[in-house]
């Protein structure tokens, strides 16, 4: 009976050791959700302030260049917002010729894959059915990804594109002005593990 009493404890200890020894599943950004990609990699509390300061510098630089930029995830991620009308004709998935005026200045930051993981999310209003909005935004996200691929000299940029349809409006879909706000592109600059480690070493 004494031996049986300790069996659950032994099994629990064994399971803990096996779990610790098992290889951790690697994070795959291309199959992760947008929420997971914006949240990963996480920043330790003691590095959060320094990472937010570095991202704050990027936010200030891009604002000075005329972009609409917000710091999200406790200031650790920069989010650039561009109205779809500045990049695409209505219902079109090909970039306008003048779209490069908005996209090209971001290329140097997008190519800093050692510092930033770049997530591109395209949103729509609720005009048309859900399937149409999903396809439209997905095709537009891929068009932006392709633009940066060619703009970089056919180099892989590591951009992770998402077409999110009309599921995440920032304003009620009532009136032209509000619908235009909802038709938007969000470009996220997420600090990489390399940047976080660099900041940690330099503290």
Where are these regions (language model features)?
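Short, well-ordered turn and helix-capping elements at secondary-structure junctions
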Residues: 84-86, 92, 107, 165, ...
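Periplasmic peptidoglycan-binding/anchoring modules of Gram-negative envelope and division proteins
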Residues: 51-73, 88-121, 187, 194, ...
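Short, well-ordered coil/turn elements that cap or connect secondary structure elements
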Residues: 16, 64-66, 113, 154-156, ...
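N-terminal targeting leaders that direct proteins to extracytoplasmic destinations
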Residues: 2-8, 16-77, 94
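Soluble periplasmic/extracytoplasmic beta-strand elements of cell-envelope proteins
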Residues: 68-70, 77-87, 117-121, 142-143, ...
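Periplasmic OmpA-like peptidoglycan-binding domain that tethers envelope proteins to the cell wall
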Residues: 123-203
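Second-shell loop/turn segments in exported
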Residues: 41-48, 86-96, 130-134
């Amino acid at each position: 009976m004494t031996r049986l009493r300790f069996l659950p404890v032994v099994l629990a200890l064994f399971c803990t050791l096996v779990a610790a020894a098992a290889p951790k599943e690697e994070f795959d950004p291309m199959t992760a959700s947008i929420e997971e990609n914006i949240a990963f990699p996480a920043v330790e509390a003691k590095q959060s302030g320094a990472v937010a300061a570095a991202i704050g510098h990027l936010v200030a630089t891009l604002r000075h260049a005329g972009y609409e930029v917000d710091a999200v995830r406790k200031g650790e991620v920069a989010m650039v917002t561009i109205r779809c009308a500045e990049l695409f004709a209505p219902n079109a998935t090909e970039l306008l010729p003048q779209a490069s005026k908005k996209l090209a200045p971001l290329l140097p930051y997008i190519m800093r894959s050692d510092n930033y993981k770049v997530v591109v999310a395209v949103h729509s209003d609720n005009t048309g059915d859900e399937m149409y909005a999903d396809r439209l935004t997905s095709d537009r996200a891929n068009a932006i990804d392709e633009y940066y691929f060619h703009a970089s000299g056919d180099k892989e940029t590591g951009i992770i594109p998402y077409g999110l349809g009309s599921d995440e409006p920032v304003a009620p879909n009532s009136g032209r002005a509000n619908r235009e706000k909802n038709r938007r592109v969000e470009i996220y600059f997420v600090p990489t593990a390399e940047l976080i480690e660099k900041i940690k070493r330099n503290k």
